[in-house]
Amino acid sequence: MGTPTSKAVVPEVNRAKIPYIGPFTGAEFLRNPANKNIFNIRASYFSETKKLVDHFINDLGYKKIAVFIQDDGYGAAGKAGVQRALRMRGLKIHAEGRYKRNTLDVEQGLNSIMTKKPDAVIMVGAYKACGAFIKMSHDKGFYPKFANISFVGTKKLIAELGDAGDGSYISQVMPNPDESTLKIIKDFKADMQSYGVDNPYYTQLEGYLNAMVIVDALEQSGQYLTRDRFIGAMEGMKNKDFGGLKVNFSKSDRQGLDNVYLTQIQDGKALPIQTMK
């Protein structure tokens, strides 16, 4: 579940005291303050956007960073992460553009950003809209550095962009399924191949890890499973090693992983990189 859906279900989660594991969003309201029933595994949007901001500034010397966002809770959560990361550097968002959810009406948002001539644009939206934004930017002769966060969907964004994707950045909350040598990656790929999937991708890996965490907590809950026992088992994960990815929870910390990885689209693939060039 993403940001708007999570925001809608959290009151019911709290009312019924149902454990909510691994929401597919980095929104801050699921993390702070800590909620007894909620356990986030993927890194927050702040961690992702900070990674992008830090690299734009440290590697490229960029300070004029714009945002293009979906006009809803998801976009607002991503924008808040960028604002916070820039504020830590004494900077502000240089320009902002928006588009309406479930549309491809990106031109007005693009024009709002173009007039300010930013060095880079961090995008928080759906893959079709973000793809349309980048392609329209190129059509208009506008070539800043583009970056998306992981929620965009790497595989779908690359397919949407075609050749226009080369050079764009995507932050990831899971290691690269094709490049990493971690044990979890080897196990994941072997298990996926047993189901006829030869080229698994990031989202599938995230679901795989989420399932591993849940199964471990169920096993640690003992013979007589209750919600409180399950929550206690989740809270008891201290540096728990899942094939090289170490998950941590506590009563006051509902963020299992903080890992963020940087990739760049090159020749139709999202390749891991250490620095922006």
Q: What do these predicted ranges mean?
A:
Residues 134-207, 264-266, 270-272:
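Extracellular/periplasmic periplasmic-binding protein-like sensory domains
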Residues 10-18, 54-62, 83-91, 111-118, ...:
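Sec-exported extracytoplasmic/periplasmic mature domains
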Residues 48-51, 98-112, 180-181:
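Structural motif
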Residues 36-42, 72, 173-178, 196-201, ...:
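Second-shell loop/turn segments in exported
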Residues 194-204, 215-269:
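Segments of small-molecule ligand-sensing domains
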Residues 48, 78, 129, 184, ...:
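Catalytic-loop motifs flanking and including active-site residues across diverse enzymes
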